[in-house]
């Protein structure tokens, strides 16, 4: 009877160890997946910042330069004081 109790205690201990190891592995997996999801979200936010901030500002800068060059091409020359 004592031997059966010893085997049962050992079995419970081994099962407890297995459950503990599985729980630790699951916890590590959850932490790693959360970190990777956070990293991916940061990358997506940087891409959105590029789309919403950087690209329009470059577009506005280029259009402004085009309008400035066009204006300089079509504006009449400055009159000299003698011509007035």
From Swiss-Prot:
PROSITE patterns: COV_E. It comes from the Viruses. The keyword Transmembrane helix applies. Keywords: Apoptosis, Host Golgi apparatus, Host membrane, Membrane, Transmembrane, Transmembrane helix. Pfam families: CoV_E (PF02723). It is a single-pass type III membrane protein. The chain crosses the membrane at residues 19-39. One of its GO terms (cellular component) is membrane. Belongs to the betacoronaviruses E protein family. This is Envelope small membrane protein. It comes from Porcine hemagglutinating encephalomyelitis virus (strain 67N). The lineage of its organism: Viruses, Riboviria, Orthornavirae, Pisuviricota, Pisoniviricetes.
């Amino acid at each position: 009877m004592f031997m059966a109790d010893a085997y049962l205690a050992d079995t419970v201990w081994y099962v407890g160890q297995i459950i503990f190891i599985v729980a630790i592995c699951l916890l590590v997996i959850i932490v790693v997946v959360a970190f990777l999801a956070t990293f991916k979200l940061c990358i997506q936010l940087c891409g959105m910042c590029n789309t919403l901030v950087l690209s329009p500002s470059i577009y506005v800068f280029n259009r402004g330069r085009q309008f400035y060059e066009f204006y300089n091409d079509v504006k009449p020359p400055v009159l000299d004081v003698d011509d007035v």
